[in-house]
Amino acid sequence: MLNKPSGISSNRALQISKRLLSAAKAGHTGTLDPMAQGLLPICLGEATKFSSTLLGVDKTYIASLRLGYISNTGDAEGEIRQVVGSDVNPPDFGQVTGILQTFLGRSSQIPPMFSALKQHGKPLYRYAREGITVERKAREIVIHAASLDTLSGFEMTITVRCSSGTYVRTLAEDIGKALGYGGAYLTALSRISVGHFELSQACDLDQLESETPVNRQKLLCPIDSLLNDIPSIVLDDDEALRLRQGQKIRKNMSRYGLPVNTQLKLYDDRNVFLGLGERIDPEVIVPRRMISLHEVVTGAIAGSVDLQ
C-alpha cells in the first residue's frame, strides 16, 4: 500500500513505485487527485489480475473545507471566488453536525467537470480547460458515515466513509450550500481507507526509495490480501496441477458449506496461493484467474499503493 503525497499524480506515483520495485506490470485501483494524499493501492506483476476487486469498494476520507467560497475545480488548485457576504456569521458545531446527517444514505451526484471521466473518449477535465461544460449523467452514491472533526470559523474538517465513485469535492460544495454559505471547496483531502486496507498499512515514496531492494519486497502485501472476502479451499498436488493447467476438477465440497457459483481462493497444501476458481457444480471447480508462480517475487507483487 502506498501513501501518496500531495502534489503528485497517481500515475506518477505508480511509475515511481513500478521502477523501484522492478515490476514489469503495474496498476493502481483508483485515482487520487494530485492535491490529495493518502492510501493508493498499487498492484504489481501477477497482482494486476486481481486489481478489479478493489475498484468498487467503500473508501474513507478526511476532508478539509472552506465555507463561503467555491472553486472551479472544487479544490484549492482552481480559481477561487467568494460567494457569501463578509458579514455572515460562521456555523456552530451542532448546525454542521445536523446538516451532515442529511447527506447519509443513497443519493444522486453529478460528477464535476474537472474529473477523469470520459465523454466521447475525451476526459471531462479537458473540456473544462477549454471552457466547455458538457452534460453529465448523475450517478448513485452512498454516504455511509459523515462526522465533524474540527470547526474553526468557516474552516472545518470532516471524515466521510462513502461508496466508490463519490466525488468528495462535489460533496464539499453541496455541504456548503446546505449550510447556507453558497458552497465550499476542499483545502485538503486524505484517503485513509480503501475497502479493508488502512492508511496505517501504507509506506510512503521516501521510505520505498531508501530501502534496499530486498526490504522493499517486504513492504508489499501478499496477492491474496486483495481477496479477503472470498472463501478459500485447499487442494492436493494433483488438483492444484490440473487447475493451473486450465482443467476443471471434481472435488468433494460438502465440508465447506458453500453454494454453487461461489468464487474460491485456491491454495495448495503448502498454503501457496494459486489464484481464483469457481464452484460451477456441487463437485466441480473450474479455474478463473490463476497466477504464474514463477513471476511472483516473494508472493508480494500484489503490493497495494494508492496513487493517480
From Swiss-Prot:
It comes from the Bacteria. It is an enzyme of class 5 (isomerase). The lineage of its organism: Bacteria, Pseudomonadati, Pseudomonadota, Betaproteobacteria, Nitrosomonadales. Belongs to the pseudouridine synthase TruB family. Type 1 subfamily. The keyword Heme does not apply. Responsible for synthesis of pseudouridine from uracil-55 in the psi GC loop of transfer RNAs. Its EC number is 5.4.99.25. CDD domains: PseudoU_synth_EcTruB, PUA_TruB_bacterial. This is tRNA pseudouridine synthase B. The active site is at 33 (nucleophile). Keywords: Isomerase, tRNA processing. GO terms for molecular function: RNA binding; tRNA pseudouridine(55) synthase activity. One of its GO terms (biological process) is mRNA pseudouridine synthesis. It catalyses: uridine(55) in tRNA = pseudouridine(55) in tRNA.
